[in-house]
Curated annotation (Swiss-Prot):
Biological process, per Gene Ontology: tRNA N1-guanine methylation
Pfam families reported in the protein's UniProt record: tRNA_m1G_MT
Name of this chain's protein: tRNA (guanine-N(1)-)-methyltransferase
Its biological purpose: Specifically methylates guanosine-37 in various tRNAs.
GO cellular component terms listed in the entry, alphabetical order: cytosol
Similarity comment: Belongs to the RNA methyltransferase TrmD family.
Higher taxonomy: Bacteria, Bacillati, Actinomycetota, Actinomycetes, Propionibacteriales
Catalyzed chemical reaction(s): guanosine(37) in tRNA + S-adenosyl-L-methionine = N(1)-methylguanosine(37) in tRNA + S-adenosyl-L-homocysteine + H(+)
SUPFAM superfamilies: alpha/beta knot
Binding locations of S-adenosyl-L-methionine: G113, L137, G138, D139, Y140, V141, L142
Length: 239
């Protein structure tokens, strides 16, 4: 999988060299390239923004640098196997199922906007050439798309076969198929007693059936309490 990042702050992505993502790059599972959008400007000030058409506050990222960057990084031929992601608060919510879908992609290009956003013709052009995703991490606004791109990267790449040392650990995470889309149950480790708080007795019983039932019940309880939108009538709570 090749990952490209277009940003006016490419140093944001230096963190991809560390931890498991860095190991994945060393092992050849992923190939990471961060690009400075200003490299495709032609004026002394390396300008990437201009005032919005129709008036209004703030600045909008100009289409020209994006177009030239696309031509050089992706090419000028349509290719639906290339996934281009525009992080945006007006995008569709990013979910675990979206991460799973993207984990089989061969090429992902992240377009990280700043200021008030990117000229929409850039998105329209990209959609005419490649597979475009406008995605949001949640109902809040960030200063730019870099943080969102990093979060999406981690959610996607950890699902690539060979990335996780123990792939079974993916099956019991929140939102996973192994959890039926529920939130993960609470986790505990040793010592059994810590500052007056004990590990639930059932987890130390060695009784696998009781442990499985406790974990399932806790997953349902937490999901109903914190994310009722994820539940359905099977758990006694309307969707």
């Amino acid at each position: 999988m090749r990952l490209d990042y277009l940003s006016i702050f490419p140093a944001y992505f230096d963190v991809l060299d560390i931890s498991l993502l860095g190991k994945a790059a060393v092992n050849g599972l992923v190939e990471v390239h961060a690009h400075d959008l200003r490299d495709w400007t032609h004026d002394r000030h390396r300008t990437v923004d201009d005032t919005p058409c129709g008036g209004g506050a703030g600045m909008v990222m100009k289409p020209d640098p994006w177009g030239e960057a696309f031509d050089e990084i992706i090419g000028t031929e349509p290719d639906s196997s290339v996934h281009v992601i525009f992080p945006s608060p007006s995008g569709a919510p990013f979910t675990q199922s979206a991460a799973q879908e993207l984990s089989s992609a061969v090429r992902i290009v992240f377009c990280c906007g700043r200021y008030e956003g990117i000229d929409h013709r850039v998105i329209d052009y990209a959609r005419s050439m490649w597979t475009v995703h406008e995605v949001s991490l949640g109902d809040y606004v960030l200063n730019g798309g870099e943080v969102a791109a990093l979060a999406i990267t981690e959610a996607v790449v950890r699902l690539v076969p060979g990335f996780m040392g123990n792939p079974e650990s993916l099956a019991e995470e929140s939102f996973s198929a192994g959890q039926d889309g529920l939130l993960e149950y609470p986790l505990f480790t040793r010592p059994v007693s810590w500052r007056g708080l004990d590990v639930p007795e059932v987890l130390m019983s060695g009784h696998h059936g009781r442990i499985a039932k406790w974990r399932r019940d806790e997953s349902v309880r937490l999901t109903c309490e914190r994310r009722p939108d994820l539940t359905d009538s099977d758990f006694g709570v309307p969707h």
